[in-house]
A protein has these predicted regions:
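Glycine-rich phosphate-binding loop signature in dinucleotide/nucleotide-binding domains
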Residues: 73-78
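Conserved glycine-rich Rossmann-like NAD(P)H-binding loop of the short-chain dehydrogenase/reductase
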Residues: 26-41
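Aromatic pocket-lining residues of Rossmann-like dinucleotide-binding sites
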Residues: 21
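Conserved glycine-rich cofactor-binding loop
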Residues: 10-12
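Hydrophobic/aromatic anchor residues within beta-strands of the central parallel beta-sheet
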Residues: 53-55
């Protein structure tokens, strides 16, 4: 299984990309900054599409938070195969 981390994945293009990645059987890192409910809904749709994933809250303008987010994702997924910086 390949792993993808998507920034801004709780809505719009990021969410659509997360769902398509799930259809391709990828493990999806769903990043959001403020809308936890939308991130939860995205994860539910990822799972409905046959995939799995993790929700990662992070303000991508904060470089230390981004490093932490990548570490959390790698710990859960094992590796990072792709990043979609939305």
């Amino acid at each position: 299984m390949k792993n993808i981390l998507i920034t801004g994945a709780s809505q719009g293009i990021g969410k659509a990309t997360a769902i398509e990645a799930a259809k391709a059987k990828m493990f999806v890192g769903i990043n959001y900054n403020q809308n936890a409910k939308a991130a939860d809904e995205c994860l539910a749709e990822v799972k409905s599409a046959g995939g799995d994933g993790i929700i990662l809250q992070c303000d991508v303008a904060d470089s230390k938070a981004v490093i932490s987010m990548f570490e959390q994702f790698k710990e859960k997924a094992g590796s990072i195969d792709a990043v979609f910086n939305n």
